[in-house]
Curated annotation (Swiss-Prot):
Entry protein name: Histone chaperone asf1a-B
Record-stated family: Belongs to the ASF1 family.
Purpose of the protein: Histone chaperone that facilitates histone deposition and histone exchange and removal during nucleosome assembly and disassembly.
Originating species: Xenopus laevis
Location (main, coarse): nucleus
UniProt GO molecular function: histone binding
Membrane-crossing segments per the record: none
Compartment list: Nucleus
UniProt keyword terms in alphabetical order: Chaperone, Chromatin regulator, Nucleus, Transcription, Transcription regulation
Biological processes, Gene Ontology terms: DNA replication-dependent chromatin assembly
Length: 200
């Protein structure tokens, strides 16, 4: 059973201009004391075509975390416009909030994001080169996609290294085809659909 549960996530300052920081108010609960840090990340999916355009906007270490309920506001600067392909600047993309413990991701919350011009004239006749200063960002806050991953909460780095060293190199060297990485926004939100749910 997961030792950390996200109880609520609120998207703040939404909708807003594209260059405004992302802000999420996160409430989570630990069922017991965690001796190590939780690492939270905000990741902006720059293009559905390739993960190379993903931008980690910020990461923060929280911990050690005592048992109980906790709340914090996680803020990150807007993505670097120069790293977003022109063809993906306007339209729908995804922002991800992930959390890991001892290097293992155990939860991922994804939101669809719609970037569009606030000026009706620009919406009707968009310029060839995106004008990020004219874009408005609207996060679909009412429908997050939550994916949970099973991890070893007790694992130490030494034990993990032993496990890696004791693996038979001939076995499990390649992922089966159904585990191969896939591209697209749906892939970013649906890593393990059987372990996910549509809302918190």
């Amino acid at each position: 059973m997961a030792k950390v549960q996200i109880l609520n996530m609120v998207v703040l300052d939404n909708p807003c201009p594209f260059h405004n920081p992302f802000q999420f108010e996160i409430t989570f609960e630990c069922i017991e004391d965690l001796p190590d840090d939780l690492e939270w990340k905000i990741i902006y999916v720059g293009s559905a075509e390739s993960e190379e355009y993903d931008q980690t906007l910020d990461s923060v270490l929280v911990g050690p975390v005592p048992a109980g309920r906790h709340m914090f506001v996680f803020q990150a600067d807007a993505p670097n416009c120069s790293l977003i392909p022109e063809s993906d600047a306007v339209g729908v993309t995804v922002v991800l909030i992930t959390c890991t413990y001892r290097g293992q991701e155990f939860i991922r919350v994804g939101y669809y994001v719609n970037n569009e011009y606030s000026d009706p004239e620009l919406r009707e006749n968009p310029p060839l080169k995106a004008h990020f200063g004219q874009l408005q960002r609207n996060i679909l806050a009412s429908n997050p996609r939550v994916t949970r991953f099973h991890i070893n909460w007790e694992c130490t780095s030494e034990a993990k290294m032993e496990d890696i060293e004791n693996v038979d190199p001939a076995s499990n060297t390649m992922l089966p085809p159904n585990c191969a990485p896939s591209k697209g926004l749906a892939a970013a939100l649906n890593t393990l659909p059987e372990n996910s749910m549509d809302c918190m």
